[in-house]
Amino acid sequence: MSERNDRKVYVGKVVSDKMDKTITVLVETYKTHKLYGKRVKYSKKYKTHDENNSAKLGDIVKIQETRPLSATKRFRLVEIVEESVII
């Protein structure tokens, strides 16, 4: 059980929900520049497994690392932190 707790957990925004049971999550992080010490924003997109197609475009979600589910999917949806408001 402790092995599962060592897996990476990220919070990001859903930028695509067009695929069946798959969402694309944009995760933004900050890293410090080695020479200048300035914080620089980095972003990366992760394909994430969404079993019930519950996450929608613009939602803030929590994802967790898991075993490879396909050629590009390595994460699964843990929870929807904040739902987006569609006007």
Swiss-Prot record:
Subunit structure: Part of the 30S ribosomal subunit.
UniProt cross-references to HAMAP family, sorted A to Z: Ribosomal_uS17_B
Span of the signal peptide: none
Encoding gene per record: rpsQ
Pfam families: Ribosomal_S17
NCBIfam families, alphabetized: PRK05610.1, uS17_bact
Function text: One of the primary rRNA binding proteins, it binds specifically to the 5'-end of 16S ribosomal RNA.
Annotated Gene3D superfamilies: Nucleic acid-binding proteins
Gene Ontology CC annotations of this record: cytosolic small ribosomal subunit
Species whose genome carries this gene: Staphylococcus aureus (strain NCTC 8325 / PS 47)
Family: Belongs to the universal ribosomal protein uS17 family.
Name of the molecule in the record: Small ribosomal subunit protein uS17
Statement: the UniProt record of this protein carries the keyword rRNA-binding: yes
Gene Ontology biological process terms in this record: translation
